[in-house]
Amino acid sequence: VPPIGWF
């Protein structure tokens, strides 16, 4: 699962 901030 990609971390918050991947967006």
Swiss-Prot record:
The keyword Cytoplasm does not apply. The keyword Zinc does not apply. Keywords: Amphibian defense peptide, Secreted. It comes from the Eukaryota. GO terms for biological process: defense response. One of its GO terms (cellular component) is extracellular region. Expressed by the skin glands. Its main location: secreted. It is found in: Secreted. Belongs to the frog skin active peptide (FSAP) family. Tryptophillin subfamily. This is Tryptophyllin-T2-9.
